Amino acid sequence: MATEEKKPETEAARAQPTPSSSATQSKPTPVKPNYALKFTLAGHTKAVSSVKFSPNGEWLASSSADKLIKIWGAYDGKFEKTISGHKLGISDVAWSSDSNLLVSASDDKTLKIWDVSSGKCLKTLKGHSNYVFCCNFNPQSNLIVSGSFDESVRIWDVKTGKCLKTLPAHSDPVSAVHFNRDGSLIVSSSYDGLCRIWDTASGQCLKTLIDDDNPPVSFVKFSPNGKYILAATLDNTLKLWDYSKGKCLKTYTGHKNEKYCIFANFSVTGGKWIVSGSEDNLVYIWNLQTKEIVQKLQGHTDVVISTACHPTENIIASAALENDKTIKLWKSDC
């Protein structure tokens, strides 16, 4: 169920974009975004764990400790369907590039591949010996990468559901896995304090990123252009790395993150922002270049565990834990 936020007249009028006299091709990042709450999506009966927009921009998928995946309209928050089949809670969900398939990672030690339109489970991926915590398709969507509390990273064949490679990746639970934009590399992060870059084809570790300190790494992903890595650590810090040089370029702070694996994002549809949830129940938005906090979104009543940025519009989805259980859709003019 989506409830819509009603705006006072004056604010709605003020939110109309004004025509710009100098509409140049490459716009500099605006000073600040103005994300406002548009819809609250209620339906999950336990903590929400992950939210992801479909690559075609039509849908939002959510996963939860209630063992369910729910599909919602990306623009209006309208509930579309529930997808069920896992025996225990789900920690992550991810879309295929054509927006037709989903993969989910569950505490039942399996991943499942789903046909979204029918809601049917096409394959169950078995092999991990502990909770599966994170998953992603490669851009070609013929492979899936998963990370588990069994400390391994696995690469799976989408068509057959067979495990192609098991990487003895880390010495603690794996918190995130992500392919770069051509699918040639995988990045993984772990509570062992490391980020590792893997060659997809060979399964070889190409690079290990180590900071001076080594707090648990709770999330990692490649930037859209594939040159950088965004990594979250459980010392209330997000860092942007040039991984080829092994150098930290930017540090983003001000939020609270010491306990949970909170997703972070690059927002690139308008201004260039970094977006993350936080343990103080807020969504934080930073200017990517200047590292300053440009907006904090208030409304959730528990830890904001997951945020997602729409592929083409200035829309953020956020999701929160057990005391809240809702998903919120926020929109900005820039």
Curated annotation (Swiss-Prot):
What is known to happen upon mutating residue 263 to W? Strongly reduced affinity for histone H3
The UniProt annotation puts the region (Disordered) at: 1-31
Share an example GO biological-process annotation for this protein: transcription initiation-coupled chromatin remodeling
Residue positions, PTM N6-acetyllysine: 112
Q: What is the effect of changing residue 322 to A?
A: Strongly reduced affinity for histone H3. No effect on interaction with KMT2A
Question: Where do the WD repeat units fall?
Answer: 43-82, 85-126, 128-168, 169-208, 212-253, 256-296, 299-333
Keywords (A to Z) from UniProt: Acetylation, Chromatin regulator, Host-virus interaction, Isopeptide bond, Nucleus, Repeat, Transcription, Transcription regulation, Ubl conjugation, WD repeat
User: Which residues carry the site feature described as Important for interaction with histone H3?
Assistant: 107, 133, 263, 322
Q: What is this protein called?
A: WD repeat-containing protein 5
